Amino acid sequence: AQHGRAAAVAAAIKRCRPDRTVLTYQGDGDALAIGFSETMYAAIRNENITVIFVNNTNFGMTGGQMAPTTLPGQKTTTSPYGRDCAVTGNPLKAIDMLKTLDIAYAARGAVTTAAEIAKTKRYIRNAFEAQLNGEGYSFVEVLSPCPTNWGMPPLAAKERVASTIQEYYPVGEFVKRREKRHD
């Protein structure tokens, strides 16, 4: 799918092939910047797809620019003095928005420790189970380090996720509706 259009393409595939398991794997820009409308409207329609969203708080594949998820004060190539929320607005908390909708499942995990990775794997499994059971839209946000664009060694980046990013974006299951949707 074109950048930002993954949820729309996934919804179309699922409607054409409802017997298939359909997922998107998206980053900050794809899911919450250029693809924000597609991500949210797939959720609003409760499309029976699974979205895996990797949040590393920057546009990691294009040079580390500020993303919708960039934390207050975080320096990026386009916010060299740190994100100023008075100018750019606050970071987008996608799950907080999704919790207001009639979706099947929403969770946020991290890849910082073996225990957190195991929980995140369980969240992803739960998201796919929701789709396989015909319950509707499922969304898993995965907090991930970005050592290259954060300008730090991998272990320090992992610690930053655990100490700073998880404080702003807490992990856990936030929506867990276990009933088949009504079409």
Regions found by a protein language model. Give the residues of each.
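Structural motif
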Residues: 20-23, 48-52, 96, 104-106, ...
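Short, well-ordered, mixed-charge alpha-helical segments that flank or form enzyme active sites
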Residues: 31-34, 58-63, 114-118, 146-150
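Conserved thiamine diphosphate
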Residues: 19, 67-133
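Short, structured patches in soluble enzyme cores that scaffold and shape functional sites
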Residues: 53, 109-110, 141-144
